[in-house]
Every structure is written in C-alpha cells, then in structure tokens.
Amino acid sequence: TGDIATGVLAEIVVDAVLQVADDDRRVGRDDVRVFTRTGASAAATELVRGVVFESEPANDNMPRSVEDATVAVLDMKLDVRSGEIDTEYTITSVDQLDAALSAEDAERRAIAETLSAAGVDVVFASKKISDPVAAHLADAGILAFSNVTESEAHAFARATGARRLGTLDDVEASDLGTAASVRVERHGGDDVTFLEGSDDSRTVTLYVRGSTDHVVDEAERAIDDALGVTVAAYEDGEIVPGAGAVEVAIADRLRSGANAVTGRKSLAVEAFADAVDAIPRTLAENAGLDPIDALVDLRAEHDAGTTAGLISEGQTGIIADPIEYGVLDPAAVKREAVESATEASTMIVRIDDVIASN
C-alpha cells in the first residue's frame, strides 16, 4: 500500500463500514465509494462522510463553497422545454425575434427562480444544464453540476436524503436534501468536489491519495479487498483465526472422519484433506519456510490444543497464534470456500466418462 500504514488503512475501512451499516448490520456495498487522486502523500488518504467526485461548476461565476446546503438532485435537462411535435415559426420582424428570445430567456430564468424560491443552494443534474440556465443559476447564487453519472446521482441522493426529481413542478421541502457543505477544491490540477453529508448520511467515500499512480492503484486494490472481507465479517458477525489455522483444523477433522468411512470413499475424504492442506503449505512457501516441516509443526500444535498459523514476521515466517497477531478471516468467507470446494469436488467425482474434443 505504498507509504500509508496498513493499520491506518484498516481503521479507515472499518469506520467506513460502520458508518453506512443499518440497524440490521446490513451494508450496501455501493454506499462505500472509492475516489483516487495523485499529487499528495498516501498519508493524506481520508474518509469523507459523503461523496467525492471530479467535476467543475456549470458556470465559472458560481460559488465554489456552500455551507449548510439545501440540495436538489435532478434527472432532467435544465433548458427551454421542447415540444413533442416539431413546430416551425415564421418571424417577420426584429420585434418578433426579440419577443421570442425574451420568452426563451424568461423560461430559463424561471428555472433558476423556481429552485431559488424552494431554497435550493446546490443542484446536481444527471443531464445537461444549458449555458444560459447556468448563468441564471449563478446569478441566483446556486452552485450547480451538469451531466453527473447515474452512480453519482444515486450517491448524492443517499448522502443528502434528497429525492431524484424529473420535474420542477410543485417542488416541496421533502423533495430536497441537506449537506453540511459542498466545496470545490483544486487537487492535482483538476477540480475535485466534496459533498459532506449530514449526520445521517448513508454514503461515504474513501479518498485515496498517493504520490504516484502505482501507489494509488496498490492502495485502491488493498482497500477493495479489505472492504469485501470487512463487510462479510460485520454482516455475518463471526470471525475465525486466519494464517492457515482453520485449514489445518479442517484437514485434521477430515482425516479423523476418513477412518469411519469404509471402502473407496475414504480415499476421497483423504484426498479432500490433502487439498485443504495446500493452503497452509502455500503460506509456508511464501513465508520462506519448508512446507513439509511447517505442516508437521502446525499439526503438532493443533493436536496439543493450540491455535497456530503461519505468520509473516520480517523477512521470514513463524508459527504462532494468529489471533495474537490480529490475523483473522470472516467465517462466512471460509464457509463459502469449503462449500464451493465440496460442490466442485462432488461434480468431478460424479463424472463417469470423458469426451475428448476432436
């Protein structure tokens, strides 16, 4: 993960999961967003309660920071409404042209006035905001963003409590959301916008920083993996020792059970146990240990009633209690792995013929 401490990264991930979890310990994975940007030390990585995204205001004269914002999330184009039927008008004088242009400008101004009258400070539109409408919004002191993505619009609504509106007819206070602040900052030569949600915001963003693209990419991959296992552990509520300790216990129970199975079935059970042993064997090799000696030592510790696994310590590995070293796995992940392996093995064993291709 580059120059960011693993402990700091882990703490940020846990905080993110806890902030978006509901009362039933369910976590919407889409509610935890990851946004990356180079140009700063990885130590600047932070958790934002809200949404971080790359976008610039629809007009340069708009404010770049709004506190205690009232937010509208719109699934509509902000411009003069076009009719369902193409209509052609014949203009025969300058006065008629001026009147037509004035009518269009009045309609565009009305969009800004409607939003302003509703108390809106910030607008996120999933479709285009025309330049004239953006200018009127700027005159009204409204910060607006055009052409936001579908995932961003969903996140804005979750972070602020706003409803996504397809029309400005009869906008009510309950349709709008709130944000502690919305601000546009310059990071790495680009405009980066921060929407800080309220206390009940259901969306958070892990803003990952790094000095190079490589550092950022490594941190993002680590965060994605960490989020997956953290969500699994939190939702299931059960964890087990990692570092191969569980696999050693499973293999031991399988071999003990194989003695009670008669005939050729016992060979299948033994083979399954050998396959499970592949995990601690691989961990031993990666830690620079002899895999056979490591397996013998692990089995001895297990027979003695001790929880033991393969822990990376400096340039080599040691056999120790993974719980003491904080090496834990979600029970749900282990359970799913065993079930999937059992299903795959059963399917292969049931094959009684092979058809060679060509």
Model regions and ranges:
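Non-catalytic terminal/interface segments that mediate subunit docking, oligomerization
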Residues: M62-Q96, D200-R202, L206-D213, D217-D225, ...
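Short, mixed-charge, low-aromatic patches
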Residues: Y89-T92, R109-T114, A179, L206-V208, ...
